[in-house]
């Protein structure tokens, strides 16, 4: 009897785990229903993503975590994306060109006299 209950409990747990995994990829999909025409200040935008689908859009994510969909063909949207890309490239270049200090000599040659 205990074995039967343990087996049923195991099956229920496994089923719950599998069912959760099946629908999880849908909830992560980002879609826009409408596009804003109101210009967003670059200083308030943290990052952006571009979606391809039934409604093509740029999703700006503000520093407060709000997601705002905008038309990728709008001039102001292209300007903001270019500005964000420039900031990102500048940060990456600064990180890559940081001085690492002086490098220790790795010469391990030994001269033997004999």
Swiss-Prot record:
| GO terms (BP aspect) | antimicrobial humoral immune response mediated by antimicrobial peptide; blood circulation; cell chemotaxis; chemokine-mediated signaling pathway; inflammatory response; positive regulation of cell migration; signal transduction
Q: Which InterPro entries match?
A: Chemokine_b/g/d, Chemokine_IL8-like_dom, Chemokine_XCL1/XCL2, Interleukin_8-like_sf
List, alphabetically, the Gene3D superfamilies matched. 2.40.50.40
Assign the protein's first listed, main location to one coarse class: secreted
Query: What subcellular compartments does it reside in?
Result: Secreted
Q: List cystine links.
A: 32-69
Q: Name one GO molecular function term.
A: chemokine activity
Keyword Transmembrane annotated: no
Position of the signal peptide: 1-21
Ranges for the region named Disordered are 91-114
Keyword field contains Translocase: no
UniProt-listed CDD domains: Chemokine_C
- What name goes with this protein? Cytokine SCM-1 beta
Species of origin: Homo sapiens
């Amino acid at each position: 009897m205990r074995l039967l209950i343990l087996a049923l409990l195991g099956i229920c747990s496994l089923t719950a785990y599998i069912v959760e995994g099946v629908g999880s990829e849908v909830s992560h999909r980002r879609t826009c229903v409408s596009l804003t025409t109101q210009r967003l200040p670059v200083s308030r935008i943290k990052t952006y993503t571009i979606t391809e689908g039934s409604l093509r859009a740029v999703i700006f994510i503000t520093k407060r975590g709000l997601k705002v969909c905008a038309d990728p063909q709008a001039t102001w949207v292209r300007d903001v994306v270019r500005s964000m890309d420039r900031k990102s490239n500048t940060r990456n270049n600064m990180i890559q060109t940081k001085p690492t200090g002086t490098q220790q000599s790795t010469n391990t040659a030994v001269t033997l006299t004999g």
